[in-house]
Amino acid sequence: MANKGPAYGMSRDVQSKIEKKYDDELEDRLVEWIVAQCGSSVGRPDRGRLGFQVWLKNGIVLSQLVNSLYPDGSKPVKIPDSPPTMVFKQMEQIAQFLKAAEDYGVVKTDMFQTVDLFEAKDMAAVQRTLVALGSLAVTKNDGHYHGDPNWFMKKAQEHKREFSESQLKEGKNIIGLQMGTNKGASQAGMSYGRPRQIIS
């Protein structure tokens, strides 16, 4: 970010549109969830987009978050003893979080790219990823989610139905509505009468 110059023209318009998608209320909810999920040791960021970005930038908080959603002994992300200071180590830590989130079930379309967070290019995408992760945690309901379940929407789950052979045979005798109905007005019993007589 230090080596990036200011954006002009169309680039600035695009960047300002991206920045308008960032939701401050959602940031508050995400911070509350991360603190509830990981414990108060993660601290709290300064309010605003930049404070949120600085808090998550080294990848440690994100790694602790995704690790807290797994049972003990099967933590997917290795967290170093001291927070990484080198740029490539921080980006690698973020990439490990993204891989673990994908393994947890977050779809690729909900994932942010490493530069979206590291260079604060699209913090709204970071929020989308965290919301998707929270929704999955609430949906799985495996006891590892901490916080208010109403913070995230529960995803729809499959409701598989099993039919016996006799039920399937009975279904063959029913006329489906796609085939039309056998009740109501029809041409049954109509008589046509005589043809029209044309005499010149």
From Swiss-Prot:
Residues 24-137 form the Calponin-homology (CH) domain. Keywords: Acetylation, Cytoplasm, Muscle protein. Coiled coil: none annotated. InterPro entries: Calponin-like, Calponin_repeat, CH_dom, CH_dom_sf, SM22_calponin. This is Transgelin. The keyword Cytoplasm applies. GO terms for cellular component: cytoplasm.
